[in-house]
Amino acid sequence: MKNKKFQPFKQYLDQDKTQKLLCDILKSADDGELFFEEKRSESLVLDDQTLKSANLDSSKGFGLRAVEGETTAYAHSTDISEKALLRAAETIKLLPSAGNVQSTSPPSKTITKLYKGIDPIIELPFSSKVDLLKEIDDYARGLDKRVVQVSASVAASVQNIWIMRTDCDLKRDTRPLTRLNVSISVEEMGRRETGSAGGGGRYALSLITDPTIWRGFVKEALRIAVLNLQAEAA
């Protein structure tokens, strides 16, 4: 499912006014930029057939950076507003002048898109994620009667960023991140051992919630647990 767009210049600030302010702030600096970020994350943990935790978090803010010679000044705030930006500007203006200003060329405009603009958090309904974790638990217990405990977790996050420079160059990026972990404990003759497996990356949640993928994680976690159970002291 597509990512809900983070639009700092439509939601919080006037773009032209902000660009003018940035140029004024950095007029005596060698380099610098204005950075906006919004991040949302969700995690669910099922432990021993019970949903133990479910967390949803979100944050946003901006950072203003100026470089002059070997000195760097940085100001940031979780409040994206003109008032907060002006306060940050006052901090940046305290940067001592290095005398001769040397202009730094901006990064290349040729950028390779690495991630799809997706939001893995809203890709699946909350109830479907809970059902998935329960299915993982049931599947693990059905593989081996020695399984006494299963812990499964799924996490997803998305980071939206905007970078504004003084040359009117405006860049944005979306960075999704997903993770699925499985931990299995087996017990035999009073001895208990645990094995874990999982995977994730900057891609859609569906790539790791596919049965062929998560079953592989379960089997690997079980293999490690059984291997530990059968291990003998050196």
Q: Which residues does each predicted region cover?
A:
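Active-site bordering "gate/hinge" segments
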Residues: 1-234
